Amino acid sequence: LHGIKRTLGTRQKAKKPILINDLKLIIKAIDKEKIRDKALILIGFSGGFRRSELVNIYYDDIEFVQEGVKILVKRSKTDQSGEGSIKAIPYFDNQEFCPVIALKNYINKRFSNINEGKIFDISDKSVALIIKRYAERAGLDSSKYAGHSLRSGFATTAAEFGAE
């Protein structure tokens, strides 16, 4: 029945984008030892990643460079042929909110003895649950956020700063 309603054009309820101030609250709500979650959220936002892209990043897809990190997205919703694209994320001045530092810290801990595998070995649905959990801990209405909130927050923030 749900699929029929969508075919007939019922409007989907859009979730709220995570904007900078909310992102800061969410990051501050993450326990210090939850370095995976911090890296996931900061990389997801700063790279404008889809949930499916985040959970399909492998160790070999990441290259740390002097300016930050390059992440190979092998396949995405709009790249069905699998040509791939590279997302470059720079270092941020504020280390607490720097996605590159958060990712480095997480990789150094998780991959200390192995150099292969998925970076975030979770499902795309888990991404949404993680976002909701920390939105709630930050005092935000978690029902208004979902996995896409990182990507839409990135796009909204970029537009506010003049990106086209």
Cite the ranges covered by each PLM segment:
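Extended, non-catalytic subsegments within catalytic or DNA/protein-binding/adaptor domains
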Residues: 1-164
